[in-house]
Amino acid sequence: MSFQSMASIAEAAREVAAASDLNTLEQIRLRWLGRKGVLTEAMQQLGQLSPETRREAGQLLNERKSEIQSLLQERKAELEAAAIHARLQQERLDVTLPGRREACGSAHPIRQTLEWIEHYFFGLGFETSDGPEIEDDYHNFAALNIPEDHPARAMHDTFYLDATRLLRTQTSTVQIRFLESHQPPLRMIATGRVYRRDSDITHTPMFHQVEGLLLDERASFADLRGLLSDFLHGFFAKPDLPVRFRPSYFPFTEPSAEIDIGCVICGGSGCRVCKQTGWLEVLGCGMVHPAVLAGAGVDGERFSGFAFGMGVERLTMLRYGVNDLRLFFENDLRFLKQFS
């Protein structure tokens, strides 16, 4: 093609205008501006011209290149707009359809269980209390009638920070601090994190506990039994749920008991969860030991009381049928959304 014929871009303009889609337009661009395009080959021939003609021809070719690029851009914009319009025509929105709700967060299952427990005991006149998670030896052990040679003090159970400070192993520490600042009669519960050196499918180094304490002039084990039986019936929404109290030992209560419920998984017939016994341990409780009352300055002749403690994760696992405690702490949204 001669340089004079390149002075006219009518042919390129016709091709661009006739392009009906983006693929065709791209082929036209390559034909005129590609590595082997008409304008590219013409520019490669500039070296064959005389210096006077070369300057004029080069200027002309650059002008034509700019004009063709402009035509291509305009046509591309037109074709893209037409494609969007056609797609919108095919994908008409039905404004009568319900909209999509925004993703919302929800309370963690452990938090839901804690709130249920707190609400239940608030309705019975209990107040809530809290205490430090970094405790001293006195409040975590000595004040709870746990002697120095008790197994609970062993390093395999407790996280010690130094010789006198540790991460609390139970929320019973709050019971002692509450007694130091309150006089009976009283009712309190304490919820919070506790720490023990253990980790498997049913234990984690950190877990949540609820501690309860009631002191009054005529508090009895019968009151304790009625309170916790009603609590378990309500928590599992099973008024006929079997509940039994087994004699046990805790240094800070006497007498002491552990509470079992009929297995909520198999209905008491025996399964892997209840180890074929038909029963599941869920609570520890007992009458407050006289030594604990005396250490807190409470008149044990006038006042008696009971205490109880429960692991929140275990109750939550049984309530929702979760078989691995660690799922509560892995923050997998697929798991957590089931409780929203």
From Swiss-Prot:
An annotated GO BP: phenylalanyl-tRNA aminoacylation
Superkingdom to which the source organism belongs: Bacteria
Necessary cofactors: Mg(2+)
Reaction catalyzed: tRNA(Phe) + L-phenylalanine + ATP = L-phenylalanyl-tRNA(Phe) + AMP + diphosphate + H(+)
EC number: 6.1.1.20
UniProt main location, coarse: cytoplasm
GO MF term list: ATP binding; magnesium ion binding; phenylalanine-tRNA ligase activity; tRNA binding
GO cellular component: cytoplasm
Binding positions for Mg(2+) per the UniProt entry: 254
Location relative to the cell: Cytoplasm
Co-factor remark: Binds 2 magnesium ions per tetramer.
Protein name: Phenylalanine--tRNA ligase alpha subunit
Organism listed in the record: Acidithiobacillus ferrooxidans (strain ATCC 23270 / DSM 14882 / CIP 104768 / NCIMB 8455) (Ferrobacillus ferrooxidans (strain ATCC 23270))
